């Protein structure tokens, strides 16, 4: 595609990669920060990777810290959930289906990848609808989908459950480990150790939720947030808007991603989720138990709920010794401060989940380190 030519979506992305505009935003950020210390946190794995790829941490003023938060769904999945999925793989005849990132995440003593190598039937799928096809092709075998993700992926899981009901695929079920973003942000805003001055809010999540669910950051904590896109100018604009609010003493929920996010989000997708799921308490790696931060399958769809259908013994949870993934996820440290980072823990040989996922902060720091 020629430079400046609009993409198929009709959006000309060259403006969001304009080096002159990026330089102007960087200069403005440096001017605003001055000799202040400002802590901003991104809570989206795609932002984490983009910030690393574009080298933004190294060109920001010394007083501006860009911290990575709990934006990677694989990373925040508790060991107990991974152990439970592995236990389900031991059911006679079971087929476990999962997104690829979950395969190498270490549980207490093993991983889905190791169990696959040992002979368990564990398959990578690119959509939960692929798991439905597998269930249809194997009517006498239980097919369990490992459901992990935030608001962006949950509607597709809800749609898959409704489709399973319509197709009469009673051998299909979902192990639901889905989480919602705002309660985790509240936990971080309440944490005095992190002292976050502003949040770079996730553009993908906000396409579903809209802006309103983040309003508590302003109302309860007087902390600004800006929904941000993923191109260089998007991210710099979001940072600039946040820094300006911090410096001027204001707080609001801004939108620097108007081409992708509107104030109301996607009500149809939310209605689909509410039809199939209900809020529940769940445990986040690094943040611990958080009330109403998870989703469970409603009783009327319990026949598709792997937790309800299968009573399996799950091993006692053991966390990897020395791994500080939890501290990374809540922004208490950067990945390079973990004693295992780049030594015993690398993308090729991960000790903790933060080094496994393509959206994890640890591989992003490892790949784009100076």
Indicate residue ranges for each PLM-predicted region.
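Metallocofactor- and cofactor-centric catalytic cores in central/energy metabolism, strongly enriched
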Residues: 2-140, 154, 158, 162-167, ...
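A conserved active-site cap/scaffold subdomain adjacent to cofactor or substrate pockets
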Residues: 175, 193-262
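Secondary-structure boundary elements
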Residues: 137-141, 163-170, 191-194, 223, ...
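Short catalytic-loop micro-motif centered on adjacent basic/acidic residues
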Residues: 40-42, 123, 144-147, 173-175, ...
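Internal helical hairpin/lid segments
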Residues: 237-327
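Flexible, glycine/charged-enriched surface loops at secondary-structure junctions
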Residues: 37-40, 171-172, 248-258, 284, ...
């Amino acid at each position: 595609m020629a430079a400046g030519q609009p993409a198929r979506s009709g959006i000309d992305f060259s403006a969001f990669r304009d080096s002159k505009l990026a330089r102007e935003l960087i200069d403005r950020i440096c001017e605003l920060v001055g000799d202040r210390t400002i802590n901003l946190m991104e809570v989206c794995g795609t932002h984490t990777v983009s910030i690393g790829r574009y080298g933004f941490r190294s060109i920001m003023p010394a007083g501006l810290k860009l911290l990575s938060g709990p934006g990677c769904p694989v990373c925040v999945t508790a060991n107990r959930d991974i152990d439970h999925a592995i236990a389900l793989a031991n059911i006679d005849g079971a087929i476990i289906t999962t997104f690829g990132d979950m395969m190498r995440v270490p549980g207490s003593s093993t991983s889905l990848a190791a169990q696959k190598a040992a002979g368990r039937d564990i398959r990578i799928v690119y959509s939960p609808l692929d798991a439905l096809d597998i269930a249809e092709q194997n009517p006498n075998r239980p097919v369990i989908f490992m459901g992990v993700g935030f608001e962006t992926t949950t509607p597709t899981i809800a749609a898959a459950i409704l489709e399973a009901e319509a197709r009469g695929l009673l051998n299909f079920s979902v192990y639901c480990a889905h989480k919602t973003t705002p309660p985790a942000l509240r936990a971080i805003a309440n944490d005095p150790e992190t002292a976050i001055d502003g949040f770079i809010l996730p553009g993908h999540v906000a396409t579903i939720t809209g802006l309103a669910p983040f309003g508590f950051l302003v109302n309860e904590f007087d902390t600004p947030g800006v929904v941000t896109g993923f191109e260089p100018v998007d991210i710099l604009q979001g940072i600039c808007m946040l820094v300006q609010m911090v410096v001027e003493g204001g707080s609001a929920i801004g939108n620097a991603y108007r081409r992708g996010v509107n104030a109301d989000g996607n009500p149809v997708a939310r209605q689909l989720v509410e039809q199939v799921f209900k809020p529940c308490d769940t445990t986040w790696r690094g943040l611990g138990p958080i009330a109403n931060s998870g989703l469970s399958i409603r009783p009327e769809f319990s026949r598709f709920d792997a937790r309800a259908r299968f009573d399996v013994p799950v091993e006692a949870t053991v966390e990897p010794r020395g791994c500080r993934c939890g501290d990374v996820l809540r922004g208490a440290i950067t990945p390079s401060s973990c004693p295992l980072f780049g030594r015993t823990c690398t993308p090729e040989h991960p000790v903790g989940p933060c080094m496994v996922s393509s959206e994890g902060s640890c591989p992003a720091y490892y790949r784009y380190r100076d």
